[in-house]
Regions:
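Phosphate/diphosphate ligand-binding glycine-rich loop within oxidoreductases
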Residues: 2-109
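Glycine-rich phosphate/diphosphate-binding loop of Rossmann-like nucleotide-binding domains
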Residues: 10-22, 109-168
Length: 168
């Protein structure tokens, strides 16, 4: 109780933002929403400064930076290098770990702990509203296969996943 978390968003969010804010409230803490576009980040404040300063104010830094390949995870690691408090990935260009873990929890509740050879299908498609990040399907492929699931990903040919994370 009485903990403070900083939620830094580089793009819009509905479910991620509200689930983290609601979770902090339900646990007796407080979440501070930070829009990167209206904060000093937009004026060039470094990940080092963010990590050091926010560490002195609270108990956790949560970051969502997912739409620019090559930037999100790197930015989070830079903040974490300087922070004295946990830095949590709310979604980056490589992974959406909290959503992926929630999906895994739901699958285990429905199908049990032994997920060997369970077949799941994931679609990654066009949306007229905005570019769909690769982090959601990529995160599902990375995590679900570690639990022995057979994952099929349906996607347009020009939508490709990153090679390196899939090798891990």
């Amino acid at each position: 109780a009485h903990k403070t978390a900083f939620l830094i968003f580089f793009d819009k969010s509905t479910r991620t933002r509200n689930s983290f804010e609601a979770g902090m409230t339900q646990l007796g803490g407080h979440a501070h929403f930070i829009d990167s576009g209206t904060s000093q980040i937009a004026h060039g404040e470094s990940p080092k400064d963010m990590g050091i300063i926010l560490s002195s104010y609270g108990h956790g830094i949560m970051i969502r930076h997912d739409l620019v390949p090559g930037e999100g995870q790197s930015y989070m690691r830079d903040v974490a290098k300087w922070a004295d408090i946990p830095v949590i990935n709310m979604q980056c260009d490589v992974d959406h770990p909290c959503q992926t873990l929630a999906d895994l929890m739901t699958i285990r509740e429905e199908f049990g702990k032994d997920l060997s050879d369970l077949k799941i299908a994931v679609s990654w498609a066009y949306a007229p509203s905005y570019v769909k990040p690769m982090s959601v399907p990529q995160g599902l492929v990375m995590l679900m296969t570690r639990f022995g699931m057979n994952v099929t990903l349906a996607h347009p040919p020009e939508y490709t996943l990153m090679d390196e994370p899939l090798r891990l």
